[in-house]
Regions:
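C-terminal region of N-terminal signal peptides and the immediate post-cleavage residues
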Residues: 6-7, 16-32
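Generic structural signal for short, solvent-exposed loop/turn connectors between secondary structure elements
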Residues: 1, 15, 90-92
Length: 182
């Protein structure tokens, strides 16, 4: 019993003298250090550079969708919506997931002569996202009057970012990354 009291006294003295002190409180950090939000993101005017493809990929902290264009990306709108709406008709497009992003590229899916540059065979599944942590479905919502829309079904309303990158060649890419967690 005396040894226990001696150890407790020594421990209390060490804490009191600052020899044993708790580490500094760390600032709250977001998942993977991502500082994204879930509010709408929009930029720029219309482009005549047509959409040529849509693809997806998985990363450690997020899932990624890439829209390829045959020229520079000039504008886009990406936002969470209650329903994905088809361009021109106003019809609702069914999209799997508990939340939906409507990705509108300010560019057509046809060239200046009206020739189709992007016409996916499976409009309800532009990319197979089975096994992705965040993505649930990627659907084509159409191209109308110079705008091309894609519906992105996700697991929940999660933070996202939008990037534009030049290349390859004279083309460019619109990138939508959606985090796995907050």
């Amino acid at each position: 019993m005396k040894k226990l009291l001696l150890w407790l006294t020594a421990l209390l003295a060490a804490v009191g003298l600052g020899i044993l002190a708790p580490g500094p409180a760390s600032a709250a950090t977001s998942y993977c250090g991502l500082q994204w939000g879930s509010l709408a993101k929009a930029q720029g005017p219309l482009s005549t550079a047509p959409v040529t493809s849509v693809r997806t990929g998985q990363h450690y902290c997020f899932d990624r969708m890439v829209v390829d264009l045959n020229g520079p990306v000039k504008g886009y709108t990406v936002r969470y919506v209650p329903e994905v709406i088809q361009d021109g008709s106003g019809f609702t497009i069914p999209v799997q997931g508990r939340a939906r992003l409507q990705v509108t590229v300010n560019a057509p899916s046809y060239d200046q002569n009206g020739n189709v540059t992007y016409n996916p065979a499976a409009k309800a599944e532009l990319s197979n996202v089975a096994g992705y942590q965040t993505f649930r479905q990627v659907v084509y919502a159409g191209s109308f009057e110079g705008y091309t829309s894609i519906g992105l079904g996700v697991r929940a309303r999660l933070p996202f970012r939008v990037l534009t990158l030049d290349g390859p060649g004279s083309g460019s890419r619109l990138i939508v990354d959606v985090a796995h967690f907050w």
